[in-house]
Amino acid sequence: MLEAKNLTCIRDDRCLFQQLSFCIAPGEIVQIEGPNGAGKTSLLRILAGLAEADEGQVNWRDKNIRRDRAKYHQDLLFLGHQPGIKSVLTPFENLLFYQSVFQKVDSAAIWQALAQVGLVGYEDLPVSQLSAGQQRRVALARLWLSPAPLWILDEPLTAIDKQGVSTLLALFVQHAAKGGMVLLTTHQDLGAVSHNVRKICLANTQEKSCLSACCAVN
């Protein structure tokens, strides 16, 4: 279980959220909602252990993630705004490298992941020669290879066509059905997802005081 405990985040003298607490249990899909500037990306980075909260802590399986960040990151797949892939490598080589870090290499699984994101035929091109959208799809292909139980995804559906969105949403449902956890931000309507999606809404009136920030959990 992932637990956010009394998290407060202040950026540029502005409080994005204050005393925010919630838990995510195995089998859940959770969407972080809120207007631009409400702190959605900051929250995801804090939960992923890539940024520090001004107050509070993040627990994974009842332990503060600061105690063993490396072990926590073995259980986590984080996809941010940047693809996080190596531009000098090809899509196939990027996925091969990613897979080799966590598990035994399975070339067939890599080919299947490339097929799922529509990159068969581009597997031998350096990533630097691909469009921004194609680079994004290389990053998303890691979802089909990841053994991590916790997925934290910042706008994973951006610049993805309708069929691609449907494919990704089906994968999220499949991951949750196996006991995984999916935490994401998106501007897409998830009403059609065949799985209960819990929503955490961050609201911020853009005032300087922390008292102006609030959070509602649906």
From Swiss-Prot:
Boundaries of every ABC transporter domain copy: 2-217
Stored InterPro entries: AAA+_ATPase, ABC_transporter-like_ATP-bd, ABC_transporter-like_CS, ABC_transptr_haem_export_CcmA, P-loop_NTPase
GO MF entry, a single one: ATP binding
Keyword S-adenosyl-L-methionine attached: no
Subcellular location as annotated: Cell inner membrane
Keywords tagged on the record: ATP-binding, Cell inner membrane, Cell membrane, Cytochrome c-type biogenesis, Membrane, Nucleotide-binding, Translocase, Transport
Gene3D superfamilies in alphabetical order: P-loop containing nucleotide triphosphate hydrolases
EC number of the protein: 7.6.2.5
Disulphide bonds in the chain: none
Catalytic activity field: heme b(in) + ATP + H2O = heme b(out) + ADP + phosphate + H(+)
UniProt cross-references to SUPFAM superfamilies, sorted A to Z: P-loop containing nucleoside triphosphate hydrolases
A GO CC term assigned to this protein in UniProt: plasma membrane
One example of a Gene Ontology biological process annotation: cytochrome complex assembly
Enzymatic class: translocase
Pfam families: ABC_tran
Residue numbers binding ATP: 34-41
Membrane topology term: Peripheral membrane protein
UniProt keyword RNA-binding, yes or no: no
Subunit structure: The complex is composed of two ATP-binding proteins (CcmA) and two transmembrane proteins (CcmB).
Assigned protein family: Belongs to the ABC transporter superfamily. CcmA exporter (TC 3.A.1.107) family.
Function description: Part of the ABC transporter complex CcmAB involved in the biogenesis of c-type cytochromes; once thought to export heme, this seems not to be the case, but its exact role is uncertain. Responsible for energy coupling to the transport system.
Protein name, as recorded: Cytochrome c biogenesis ATP-binding export protein CcmA
